[in-house]
């Protein structure tokens, strides 16, 4: 078991979900998962797993698992966070992660919060930085007709996707297919 303690922050989409099982498979201890709250108000609240079938919002075998389901399957606590403030800083101090990992989060994280974990924050960005910095990199990749792209893991700073690059992996998009579906298929096969 790896001694590294990670707080994972993401959205409910597939790109946010996929890195979590990879961290767990590597033996990394994930101390918690944070997702955005539906209400953009200050504060955080812990989400409890749904146990009764009658409480499930969707009863279909075709519903794809999301980041919350994946965390609960591995008994990892999940918090919904509103606007980032003192409460998330307090949660970081309580959980004592060595690093926070982010994949597709919809809020800019303040510098004071970025400095809380010992090794800072790492972001998984679905493009080869510095190209397509900022929100919606997949949209801009497809709009530009790019067929060679990749994934970047970088340290977060107070800029938007401007931190030092830790690693990059190239990825070819299928020829003549420039849709999110083809990206998801490509990334799923890796």
Question: PLM features: what roles do these ranges have?
Answer:
Residues 1-190:
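One-carbon transfer enzymes
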